[in-house]
Amino acid sequence: MKRYVFMLSDGTGITAETLGNSLITQFENIQFEKITIPYIDSTHRAESVVLRINQCFSEQGTKPLVFMTLVDPEIRQAIKKAHACVFDLFSIFIGPLENELEEKSSYTVGRTHGVANVKSYSHRIEAIDFALSHDDGIKTRGYDKADIILIGVSRCGKTPSCLYMALQYGILAANYPFTEEDLVGFRLPEVLRPYKPKLFGLTIDAQRLQQIRSERRPNSKYASAEQCRLEVTEVEAMYQRENIPYINSTKYSIEEISTKVLAIAGLQRKI
């Protein structure tokens, strides 16, 4: 079974996507065709979106699902005229909140992902810049400013996790990869030892590591099963010897890896 899913927003669409995806992923036997439409900022644009939704209904004969985060009541009403099952994620919560807080909402578009807080936005940019300039052990100077330093073998999820922590949490995250040369008589590299309290390890199942590396450099020693097993075994042994906290990233998304790392490390959101 296939169902169309529309994620509609008067802003970036990130909130509608996040909430919508969280809900539909609970239905594993249904194939969803997802369509995100951001910046629906007028009734005219809303009407064109309704035409598109109705076309999907006509072609398939089943109502598309619509998850919308639209502030303007007129635009919301326009969308609700579509032949669809509409989930108004804004009005579901804003009414009860107004009652509880005894204050009317400002009904301002784009507050969640806009630049309403300049200080917070600047810190986010600083964190992203830090993650990029301290990626893959490129620059170890500045590690004293890091909130956390992810370490691990190549291709275990360090870079995307650092970028996610920077973007979503404002965390200054660096990462350092262990190379084949590091693994000869493997010990914690001396460049990392002064920052040991900031170190957090990632590991990964050797079989999964081989799959990932084979996509990048097939038929190489780097991607061989033996090399992957050796690196994972040596790195995990070092984590245990040095009492460095670590998690296995194999079955987790980048979002889950980042959240688990921050929770275990005791780091709090900065933005």
UniProtKB/Swiss-Prot annotation:
Reactions catalysed: [pyruvate, water dikinase] + ADP = [pyruvate, water dikinase]-phosphate + AMP + H(+); [pyruvate, water dikinase]-phosphate + phosphate + H(+) = [pyruvate, water dikinase] + diphosphate
EC number per UniProt: 2.7.11.33, 2.7.4.28
Residue pairs linked by disulfide bridges in the UniProt entry: none
Pfam families: Kinase-PPPase
Enzyme class name: transferase
Binding annotation for ADP: G152, V153, S154, R155, C156, G157, K158, T159
Keyword set includes Nucleotide-binding: yes
Coiled coil: none
GO molecular function, one term: phosphotransferase activity, phosphate group as acceptor
Keywords annotated in UniProt: Kinase, Nucleotide-binding, Serine/threonine-protein kinase, Transferase
Task performed by this protein: Bifunctional serine/threonine kinase and phosphorylase involved in the regulation of the phosphoenolpyruvate synthase (PEPS) by catalyzing its phosphorylation/dephosphorylation.
Sequence similarity: Belongs to the pyruvate, phosphate/water dikinase regulatory protein family. PSRP subfamily.
Protein name: Putative phosphoenolpyruvate synthase regulatory protein
Upper classification of the organism: Bacteria, Pseudomonadati, Pseudomonadota, Gammaproteobacteria, Legionellales
